Amino acid sequence: MPSNYASYPSLIDRTVFITGGADGIGSALVEQFARQGSKVAFVDKNVEYALATIQRCVDAGVAHAPTFYEVDLLDIDALQAACASAIVALGGVTVLVNNAANDDRHDWRDVTPEYFDDRINTNLRHYFFAIQALAPQMLEAGVGSIINIGSSSYMMKEDGFPGYAIAKSAVEGITRTMARTFGPDGVRVNTVLPGWVPTERQLAKWWTPEGEQSTMNNQSIKRRILPDEFAQMVLFLAADDGAACTAQQFLVDGGRR
């Protein structure tokens, strides 16, 4: 591990399932957990990027190469089948990171009922059904950590993707409801919200000098927040070090809000 990042003994051999792990923040999550010695399985529909993520982990000399399942998260049956396979392959799953999302820009005037449903299904629905598939064996074991990746976009009143922002605001509802339900049986549920974390996709599709300057004007930390830095908060909540944290939301936004 880089000397400036913590190592968590409790994450060695810990079993982790991540949605949307092929690129961006998801890829950073897969790599950072693997570097901790965790046994990681992840799903995504981008096979090329997923294999590249696995190769980076292998090249880094991780103890356990990540396991990949090709899944379109709009297909709940396929997602839950991958969850079941991961339970067998990893010997159980004790950490779930619901990460996959799509923040494509759209004008509210152009949104049809079908497109609205697609935004909800892409950015919210699969969170619940991954929990439904993996939580029972966590509850039976009496231990587990579920980390839902949200977005600060709705807090910041950001414009240009209402379907995404609406779906992401509901992630906090999943977190708090399920934290109350699962807490008595030792399973924690939290939300981690990124601010502006410039991934390859973000930079290619939407970056402008003016947009970055506006972000820097609002951030207390006057630099870009890196995907690996965001991942550190998730690692903490997955580790035993975060054992007293549940039903909370944690912002990693450089003090933007």
Kindly label every feature range from the protein language model:
Residues 15, 22-23:
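Conserved glycine-rich cofactor-binding loop
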Residues 107-120, 215:
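Substrate-binding pocket helix/loop in short-chain dehydrogenase/reductase
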Residues 2-10, 156, 235, 246-257:
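Short C-terminal tail/terminal secondary-structure segment
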Residues 136, 180-184, 243:
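Alpha-helical segment proximal to the catalytic Tyr-Lys
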Residues 131, 143, 223-252:
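C-terminal substrate-recognition "lid" of short-chain dehydrogenase/reductases
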Residues 131, 167, 175:
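Active-site helix of classical SDR
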Residues 151:
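Residue(s) in the substrate-gating loop at a strand-loop-helix junction
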